[in-house]
Amino acid sequence: METRNRTIHLTDAIWTEILARLPLRIIARFKSVSKTWKSTIESVYFRRLFVSVHRKSSTSWSLMWYGQKDLVGFHGCETWGLPKSLSFYIPSSLCIIEGSSHGLVLISENDDDCCFVGNPVLQQWIKIPPPPVHSSVFGLVSRVDDDGFVLGFKVVKLAEVIVTNNYVSCSLSVFVYSSETGIWTCKTIHCPYQITNFGSFTLDGTIYFDHLSEPGVLVAYDFYSEISDQFWVIPLPDHPNHGFNSDFKGALTTSQGFVMYIRTLAQSSSNVFKAWRLNNDSTWQLLWKIGLPSLIGDYVPMAMHPFDSDIVHLWSQDHRHVVSWNLRTQKNRILGAEDNDEDHKDCYLNQPVCEECMDEICGCKASVRLLQLVLPRWMESVPCPPQVEMMNTASVISYVTSMQETMIRNWLHQ
């Protein structure tokens, strides 16, 4: 009996549709198949098709304590298909995580003059040259197009803080490195209050500070508009000056491209949770006001889900665990409590770091501000400054190791 081999020929359009349904980690491998496939995958059409197909899918993200410590990591999502937590791909044994913006990560060696910006999963890194004057890492901001794809980034470093107006206000002397020019520029920004803690958080091109000499306000500066040399002031919503009330706990976070202010207030009958979104006109919109069940106990808001403003993550001080709470469905789940939990099988929870971090924050009675390390919805290359060569992760590790060894030798010979 004769057996016939049949070859099925698929059109380019069908192949494109098939590719768009694969995780980015797999799609990246197809770029090396041929120049045609590489051109197709790097086209604007394919990029938009992929994002459209995966618009309801989450992407890998981690909740981190500034520095090197990973609290919670979500991976294995359909968008990237990572087998491990996002922080695994960052050479944290050698570098400190300073900031993140639209999938780009800013890391530094212990010497603030040495820092890198890159995508840890794509293993693409840009070495940022030192500024003219020694300064400390301040933040990472980025510029995106209408589809949310990164066009460029800026690294901001703090050179000097000048106290003004009899210790009421201050001026910041900063250096700004642009990926579009590859050079540092210097500028001075004026703040109407004293900044008591320079831990900041960023969204797009804007840096925000909330630890100020004046309670109940934020200050912000957009490094891409730069129409003014003044921080603008944003009053926090419904702020009754609970700064020293242990029943009041707040956090600044981001979700779905907006700054979010979330807070809890323990009352005799229930725990009240509120969430506001900062609109583009600097007004606050109340999204949630809801009583949470007493089974959660005395809890602290940690962060909103970066892609779903219905979901908040909370830390239970009484029971020492992280709760993922869906505000719309009223369902909650303790992360890491069930080994066979299908909804969170790709969730990494660092229990000791969670306890250490949240105990320190709660002990200081400060607002919670954790770093949301979020991969983008597309594997866009890191914007490369003019005449700068891209480095891979192995090269970064080798470079930093060599610097550390040289520093140790110089110290021993002093």
From Swiss-Prot:
It comes from the Eukaryota. InterPro entries: At3g26010-like (IPR055290), At3g26010-like_b-prop (IPR056592), F-box-like_dom_sf (IPR036047), F-box_dom (IPR001810), Gal_Oxase/kelch_b-propeller (IPR011043). SMART domains: FBOX (SM00256). Residues 5-52 form the F-box domain. Disulfide bonds: none annotated. This is F-box protein At3g26010. It comes from Arabidopsis thaliana.
